[in-house]
């Protein structure tokens, strides 16, 4: 009741692309992305062209997709750099600021869970008139919280010649991120088929991890026979890795033990079959404030929340899925006349769930529901 908002610092955030700020896990400061001071007015289109639009053909055959709203000339490039350029700034709760690294087209500036490092992704030239910005060159590096370079993970080159296909990806390491369950461990994915889904091979992708201080060899975590599509970290013994293949509408989920590198496929289905959708694992925040798998008291059962498609319409549900036995128990499902979804589980032991409920006659509201006795408050 006595709290009030205050202005922390006056530098405007650059919110045009990506996440503009991240809280550190100790809640003592933020890593922000700000507009560069003194950047001036936007560039103006000259009435005199500087010259023709030039594109190089280096003699390589490459299939090219058709995209909308690409860069088309040097003026587009100037506008792109003007609006996208940013400065990473650390700010504490007293408003004291410190610049981190150099200004650039910052794609990502995510601190590690323990707050000691920053995963920095910077888009750089040469730009392309053939592909969107996520195919532009990207320098991926780790800085310490003071802004000092620690390790360069990869300088991803311009990707104009990726094979045609929904499951085609760039070759080499990609999809870098922090392990949510550890203080400072990077994970990334690398294609085993050169990124070409038409190549016949047993495995498509491999996931690796790299521990701080990042000067050791990466450790392989799991090989996937389909294209990597995501990972949810639990703890040192549990992670769920997802893969999919667009051409056959297939998705798989693997139970992986990050400690001993064992892996077991636990879900294999068509992602277009909504009736058989097992839902998504529910998460909880760990000591770093990062989402990790929410486990029941036995430490090997996860809670799954889904839309619950049925002939009567969507009836959202919560299931318990035992990762050892693979047995599923439905512990709650919405009932007409309400549409009610599980937002989070407050207490996995007492099974107290926060839900959002609405109907034709009631506006959406939030409730605490006991899944043991059915009481709602």
Predicted regions span which residues?
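Beta-propeller folds
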Residues: 1-375
